[in-house]
Amino acid sequence: MTGFSVSLFVSNLSNVASYLSPIFENIPSTKVVPAQIEKVVSLVSRTGRDLQRYDHAGYRQVVGCVPYRYKKQEVNGVETQVIQVLLVSAQKGKGMLFPKGGWETDESMEEAALRETIEEAGVTGELEEKLGKWQYKSKRHSIIHDGYMFALLVSQEFERWPEAEMRQRRWVSLDEAREVCQNWWMREALEAFINLKCLADDDESGN
């Protein structure tokens, strides 16, 4: 490249920089790209079992929620509130169940419960009482699990969530949940939830 060509190239580059400088100055200094990336990451489920938590006996630790809401309903002209619970379809096989998954070593039990509920059911809210602990054996792997369940009062329901393409979710009555929930230990967790909430409602009503 001749000296004249180099000089012309540098001159043109300088002109381009001078032209673009005011444009860049007018661009807001907010961190747009990280915010967009964060939204994408939030739609991805954790995979693998490298961080999976096991107890001293080698039992896999699993945690989940009974997500619920109060729904207004009119009966004989009287408006009341009834409890509905949220079920999700099984990822493999048929049936409906409550959201649950592995409790990992880098999170608390409560954090795991909220994370799994967002990943599988696309809802979040206020985590309430622990409903109990159940031991069950996995049908696929014949591994014993310790399953913990919490009540979760739903405050936010997302249109898009990590497992939306793999699962369906459905709000159902307590009676329907008793019929369609496929796991025996989750049905027991549901009964614990019903006993807890019915007693609380009775106390509030003075009965």
Swiss-Prot record:
UniProt-listed InterPro entries: DDP-like_NUDIX, NUDIX_hydrolase-like_dom_sf, NUDIX_hydrolase_CS, NUDIX_hydrolase_dom
Catalytic activity: ADP-D-ribose + H2O = D-ribose 5-phosphate + AMP + 2 H(+); NAD(+) + H2O = beta-nicotinamide D-ribonucleotide + AMP + 2 H(+); NADH + H2O = reduced beta-nicotinamide D-ribonucleotide + AMP + 2 H(+)
Family (UniProt): Belongs to the Nudix hydrolase family.
Residue sites binding Mg(2+) per the record: E116, E120
Transmembrane segments: none
Known cofactor(s): Mg(2+); Mn(2+)
Gene3D superfamilies: Nucleoside Triphosphate Pyrophosphohydrolase
Tissue: Expressed in roots, stems and leaves.
UniProt EC number: 3.6.1.-, 3.6.1.13, 3.6.1.22
PANTHER family: DIPHOSPHOINOSITOL POLYPHOSPHATE PHOSPHOHYDROLASE (PTHR12629), NUDIX HYDROLASE 4 (PTHR12629:SF15)
Protein name in the entry: Nudix hydrolase 4
Pfam families: NUDIX
UniProt keyword terms in alphabetical order: Hydrolase, Magnesium, Manganese, Metal-binding, NAD
GO molecular function, one term: ADP-ribose diphosphatase activity
Top-level taxon of origin: Eukaryota
Organism, as annotated: Arabidopsis thaliana (Mouse-ear cress)
